[in-house]
Amino acid sequence: MDDKQHTSSSDDERAEIATSNQDQETNSSKRVHLKRWQFISILIGTILITAVITVVAYIFINQKISGLNKTDQANLNKIENVYKILNSDYYKKQDSDKLSKAAIDGMVKELKDPYSEYLTKEQTKSFNEGVSGDFVGIGAEMQKKNDQIMVTSPMKGSPAERAGIRPKDVITKVNGKSIKGKALDEVVKDVRGKENTEVTLTVQRGSEEKDVKIKREKIHVKSVEYKKKGKVGVITINKFQNDTSGELKDAVLKAHKDGLKKIVLDLRNNPGGLLDEAVKMANIFIDKGKTVVKLEKGKDTEAIQTSNDALKEAKDMDISILVNEGSASASEVFTGALKDYNKAKVYGSKTFGKGVVQTTREFKDGSLLKYTEMKWLTPDGHYIHGKGIKPDVTIDTPKYQSLNVIPNTKTFKVGDDDKNIKTIKIGLSALGYKVDNETTQFDQALENQVKAFQQANKLEVTGEFNKETNNKFTELLVEKANKHDDVLDKLINILK
């Protein structure tokens, strides 16, 4: 199996992945030769509520990997002996794969580091899909609404679009099997599969139900969206993946063609991605030979610099960056660089604050180890880990847009005291219901408002915040957040 190749190139530089034989346990340790320097491929990642996204970077390493000392060798021998004993002598037959995974998980857990983890072959595949933006499927965005799986929209030119799938189509079966009661991610997994294989969707459109056969293909999800809002160009960057820099460049050129001078780069809830893309993206606005990020391990520091001239069409643009607490990793690298060079003004709320770096090692069986190895700093030397980047101008996110999802396995009623009850109160207030406090107490006044909510949405009126009420509550808050972007609207008004 070949390593996934992470490259960084420009007109006069080309990065190549070279296989290292220094690590006998791994299929290959990723190495990059860039001009006369030797780098290793590393990852900066962040863990948010629902996902882990990583970022590729490059760091100069002077030292060779050292051999094991006597103590290390003794410990390794002990681990090997325990594995052999339990695998062969334990009175119940053991799964050797599970034993080895448990041993690795135990070592990683001992680090007490949320950014270090061991990924199985399947998890590694998803990890790589997230970094590349490529997956095999039909190219249809879906959502769960009213306990139904509904197509939000088929991607332009996708197999789903060519097969006639339309927005608001309800999927009832996948390959003849009902999906009733299944979670959205389970349905997505069923729809995806191997390239050039077929999947049959049973689709309900109005009163009509029919089967649609669709051939799965490799799909690339774009990471950049551009739209014109009055005299302001809004460029939304969802993550930093392969060729995000190219997509950003295209968006900037479109804005220039539209005659726009004021540009908003929306990085809210962008959890990160490839660092070499972040460097290339910064290079669109920052001239050649400037440091974008500093990588530090012990006493060793390496400055990662831009390699091209800035894009001439971007030089006269007034750049604003919009961030929030979900902007992390590569988002912070990019924002920190433009802020340090006074190339952009930062708006919104404080960023996540992720300033450590992970290295990945992939094993022969396709599994992967990710562990923290170093930290990164902005060009001016700011270490933002645990602190985040403070905006130049604060625009607070409405409370309801920052709420955690309430578990639908619990029912809340009068007399209960729980942190989720505060979330219920904030959410109901945002939806127009009268709530006079934001405590964690489920009081009589809240019961009355829950009853009003249930009645308005044709649910069983009990006054208890149960699973059905929770699902509708979450659905309406998501719809409200998608329809009304108060923070972006405030920023555009500031820029007028």
From Swiss-Prot:
Membership in a protein family: Belongs to the peptidase S41A family.
Domain of life of the organism encoding this protein: Bacteria
Compositionally biased region (Polar residues): 18-27
Keyword hit for Cell membrane: yes
Annotated SMART domains: PDZ, TSPc
Location of the PDZ domain: 124-206
Chain intervals with Basic and acidic residues compositional bias: 1-16
Name of this chain's protein: Probable CtpA-like serine protease
Localization (cell): Cell membrane
Classification via InterPro entries: ClpP/crotonase-like_dom_sf, CtpA/B_N, PDZ, PDZ_6, PDZ_sf, Peptidase_S41A, Peptidoglycan-bd-like, PGBD-like_sf
Taxonomic source organism: Staphylococcus aureus (strain MSSA476)
Keyword Hydrolase set for record: yes
NCBIfam families (UniProt xref): prc
Topology of this chain in the membrane: Single-pass membrane protein
Region of interest called Disordered, as start-end residue ranges on this chain: 1-27
